[in-house]
């Protein structure tokens, strides 16, 4: 084994203050995913309406395609592109180890995806610029290229993202294709494809209501045509169930009540989707109702809520990993845990504290460094998901034991990676912060306390939560 495997990679420090780092990238990511999926589905919707216009089935098709594409250009090619760049920027700041591993393993997949994205942008701008000068068949072909390229971009990205949860045989072979075509690849891809179509139908309904010069009957006819893009929602329960059953057993347990937060967000996503699907099937398709702009916008807002809930669940069920069995959510690897419990995690951190003078003792400064290396990716001190609130109700003994046995305390947490002295330092630091940072704070270096912490660390071990291991063994035995 390469000795460097036991040393953590250290990157420059970024601090978002009271905003949790994961929340910063998560919020931006949800917005970007929502826009990107609308753009992909919008391509197929425009191609279909262009075909309806060419074949004489819909006299207003040309107007609708032009209106939808103007919105698509603004949202996808401008806002979507900006948020896409923002995703890369925040990713390399929040979890550079994770994004670095993804690029190392799938650099040719990323390169292929960028080619598809480039093709999508070129085809889209060519259609926007030369649409009025092209023959109908040429416009149809250009929209087909745009649609297929957009979906192709989703195809490649989906493989990388689903690999984080279910790397499959990649953990043994490290083959790109074993990692890419992983157990959740197909259910995830098909589910996202349905979402793309649904968002396109809802977005088009909003655009139709904003188009001037249309009669009520014309708007109703166009909206009813767009409602066909919502019918694939009928497959969502099957695809969602397929995805859930393809998850590792411990990940599945988080959304089945093991984690109240993840279960709640799953219910939000499922509930919002059910409301949209019910309205689409019964109201728009069966009864062929007209919906005004306010109702269409409300349905789109529900779709955004469903997207947010689904993306939160997708991120959350990977816990305690960022890449399953390879990289923990706090950017340490399973191979590093035992080593760091001997050497300490802070000895590898070359960056000094910018506010060192604010800490009354060396122990508190050390605790801040431990927090920065072990906790800051997913927690703040006193803000969102703040440790002072999460640990404030525990006694001092409980704080020490619960952090030492972290993966037992919360099954979705990684094992603590550090020495007993570092663990005591971070506990004292959180207590000091909870006490509103007093000017004086006694150091805690009782050998008996450190020995007890060492015993707890030994009892907890360096593996994930016992329940997770038990579920994994049961799954293998089946």
Q: Which residues does each PLM region occupy?
A:
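Alpha-helix capping/termination and helix-coil
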Residues: 211-214, 374-382
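Sequence context surrounding c-type heme c attachment/ligation sites in exported
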Residues: 314, 318-339, 361-376, 384-398, ...
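Extracytoplasmic/periplasm-facing segments of secreted or lipoprotein envelope proteins
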Residues: 359-361, 368-374, 455-465
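Extracytoplasmic electron-transfer domains, predominantly the class I c-type cytochrome c fold
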Residues: 377, 382-442, 458-464
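Short, low-complexity, Pro/Ser/Thr/Gly-rich segments in the mature regions of secreted, periplasmic
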Residues: 451-477
């Amino acid at each position: 084994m390469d000795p460097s495997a036991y040393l953590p990679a250290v990157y420059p420090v970024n601090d978002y203050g009271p905003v949790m780092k994961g929340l910063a990238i998560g919020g931006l990511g949800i917005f970007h995913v929502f826009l990107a999926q609308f753009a992909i589905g919008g391509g197929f919707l425009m191609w279909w309406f262009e075909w309806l216009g060419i074949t004489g089935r819909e006299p207003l098709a040309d107007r609708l395609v032009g209106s939808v594409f103007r919105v698509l250009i603004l949202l996808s090619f401008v806002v979507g592109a900006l948020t896409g760049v923002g995703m890369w920027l925040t990713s390399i700041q929040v979890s550079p180890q994770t994004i670095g591993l993804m690029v190392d393993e799938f650099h040719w997949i990323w390169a292929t995806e960028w080619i598809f994205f480039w093709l999508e942008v070129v085809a889209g701008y060519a259609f926007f610029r030369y649409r009025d000068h092209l023959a109908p068949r040429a416009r149809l072909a250009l929209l087909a290229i745009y649609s297929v390229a957009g979906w192709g971009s989703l195809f490649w990205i989906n493989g990388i993202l689903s690999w984080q949860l279910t790397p499959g045989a990649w953990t043994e072979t490290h083959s790109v294709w074993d990692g890419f075509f992983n157990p959740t690849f197909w259910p995830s891809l098909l589910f996202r494809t349905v979402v793309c179509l649904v968002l396109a139908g809802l977005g088009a309904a909003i655009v139709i209501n904003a188009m001037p010069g249309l009669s009520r009957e014309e708007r109703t006819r166009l909206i009813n045509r767009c409602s066909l893009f919502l019918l694939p929602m009928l497959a969502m329960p099957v695809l969602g169930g397929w995805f859930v059953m393809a998850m590792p057993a411990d990940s599945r347990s988080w959304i089945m009540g093991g984690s109240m937060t993840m279960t709640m967000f799953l219910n939000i996503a499922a509930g919002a989707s059910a409301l949209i699907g019910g309205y689409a099937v019964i109201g728009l398709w069966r009864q062929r109702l007209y919906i005004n702009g306010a109702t269409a916008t409300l349905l789109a807002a529900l779709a955004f809520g469903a997207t947010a809930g689904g993306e939160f669940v997708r991120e959350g069920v990977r816990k305690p990993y960022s890449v399953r069995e390879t990289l923990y959510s706090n950017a340490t690897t399973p191979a590093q845990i035992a080593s760091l419990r001997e050497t300490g995690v802070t000895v590898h951190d070359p960056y000094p504290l910018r506010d060192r003078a604010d800490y009354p003792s060396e122990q508190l400064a050390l605790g801040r460094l431990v927090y920065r290396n072990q906790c800051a990716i997913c927690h703040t001190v006193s803000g969102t998901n703040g440790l002072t609130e999460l640990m404030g109700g525990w006694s001092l003994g409980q704080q020490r034991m619960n952090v030492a046995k972290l993966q037992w305390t919360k099954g979705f947490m990684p094992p603590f990676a550090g020495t007993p002295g570092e663990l005591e330092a971070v506990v004292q630091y959180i207590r000091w912060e909870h006490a509103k940072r007093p000017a004086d704070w006694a150091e805690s270096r009782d050998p008996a306390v450190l020995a007890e912490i060492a015993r707890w660390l030994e009892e907890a071990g360096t593996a994930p939560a016992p329940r997770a291991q038990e579920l994994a063994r049961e799954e293998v035995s089946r």
